[in-house]
Amino acid sequence: MSGLRTLLGLGLLVAGSRLPRIASRQSVCRAGPIWWGTQHRSSETMASAAVKYLSQEEAQAVDEELFNEYQFSVDQLMELAGLSCATAIAKAYPPTSMSKSPPTVLVICGPGNNGGDGLVCARHLKLFGYQPTIYYPKRPNKPLFTGLVTQCQKMDIPFLGEMPPEPMMVDELYELVVDAIFGFSFKGDVREPFHSILSVLSGLTVPIASIDIPSGWDVEKGNPSGIQPDLLISLTAPKKSATQFTGRYHYLGGRFVPPALEKKYQLNLPAYPDTECVYRLQ
C-alpha cells in the first residue's frame, strides 16, 4: 500500500475519513451540481426528444463523411471533442463547487480515439483550474497520440504507472473520474486491463463523467449492470444507448457538424446558445 501511495505522489490516505466531494452552497442558479441537494437547471437546458439518437452504423457513417467528404482530420475533431468534454465537466462540476483546490480528476484513457479525446480533455481541464491525473495503460505508437501525451507532460499533468486497485482509494484521491476508455466503435469483449478498471469504476462513490458512451455499454442497448456515470457527454449526436442513461447531466458536445450533413441524417441538433460548444440535453 505505501509503495502505491509513493507512486501516486499524493501522500498518506487518512483512514476512516471521507471529505464531502461537493461543498455546500447557497441557492444559486448555475450549471454546477449540489451533490446532496436540489439543483436549478441552466437556462440552456431543453427537452432532448427531438434530437436523433444514432445507431452504431449511423454514427460510423456520419464520422466517415466528416473525414472523407468534408475533409476533417482526426486531430482536428479530437481537439474539438476534448474541449467540449472539458467544458461540459466545468459546467457540471465547477471548480468552486469542489472540496479540494485545485479539484483532483482522474482521466482514464483507452487505446483508441476516445482515449485521445480524454488526453485533450485533461489538457483543457488543467487550463480550467483542475488538477488532472491520467491513467493511459495501452498507448498507440502513433505520432498523434504521442504528441498528445507530450503536451500533457509539458503541462505537468502526471501519468499513473498503475491503477489504484480499490474503489475506496480512487474515492479518497480524486473528486471526479473521466471515463475515456471506449467509444461508439468498440465491439467485442472487454479485455484486461480494462475489465479490471471497469470493475473498480463500478464501485466508486465519486461521480464518473463518460465521453460519448459509458465504457462497456452496448452502443445501442446500453448496460444496466455496467458503470453508471453521473455525466454523459455525447459527441456529434447522442447514441441510442444514451436513452438508458440515468445520471444527472447529459451534454451534447462537438459543435462542428456541417448543416448539410445534419440535414442529410436528420440529426435535429439543438441550437447552441451564443458561442457555446456544448448543449445540455438533460
UniProtKB/Swiss-Prot annotation:
Q: Name one GO biological process term.
A: sprouting angiogenesis
Reaction(s) the record says it catalyses = (6R)-NADHX = (6S)-NADHX; (6R)-NADPHX = (6S)-NADPHX
Q: What does this protein do?
A: Catalyzes the epimerization of the S- and R-forms of NAD(P)HX, a damaged form of NAD(P)H that is a result of enzymatic or heat-dependent hydration. This is a prerequisite for the S-specific NAD(P)H-hydrate dehydratase to allow the repair of both epimers of NAD(P)HX. Accelerates cholesterol efflux from endothelial cells to high-density lipoprotein (HDL) and thereby regulates angiogenesis.
Could you give the subunit structure recorded for this chain? Homodimer. Interacts with APOA1 and APOA2.
Primary location group: mitochondrion
- Name by which UniProt lists this protein: NAD(P)H-hydrate epimerase
Q: Where is the YjeF N-terminal domain?
A: 59-269
Superkingdom to which the source organism belongs = Eukaryota
Which residues make up the binding site for K(+)?
A: 114, 179, 215
Keywords for this entry?
Answer: Isomerase, Lipid transport, Metal-binding, Mitochondrion, NAD, NADP, Nucleotide-binding, Phosphoprotein, Potassium, Secreted, Transit peptide, Transport
In this UniProt entry, the residues modified to N6-succinyllysine are 138
GO cellular component assignments: cell body; cilium; cytosol; extracellular region; extracellular space; mitochondrion; nucleus
Task: Return the similarity comment.
Answer: Belongs to the NnrE/AIBP family.
Query: Top enzyme class of this protein?
Result: isomerase
Q: EC number(s) in its UniProt entry?
A: 5.1.99.6
The record describes how the cofactor is bound as: Binds 1 potassium ion per subunit.
- Which residues of this UniProt protein bind (6S)-NADPHX? 113-117, 183-189, 212
Location(s), subcellular:
Mitochondrion; Secreted
Which post-translational modifications are recorded for this protein?
Answer: Undergoes physiological phosphorylation during sperm capacitation, downstream to PKA activation.
Name of the gene this protein is made from = Naxe
Q: Write one Gene Ontology MF term.
A: identical protein binding
- Transit peptide, UniProt annotation: 1-53
Which NCBIfam families does this one have? yjeF_nterm
A Pfam family (short name) is: YjeF_N
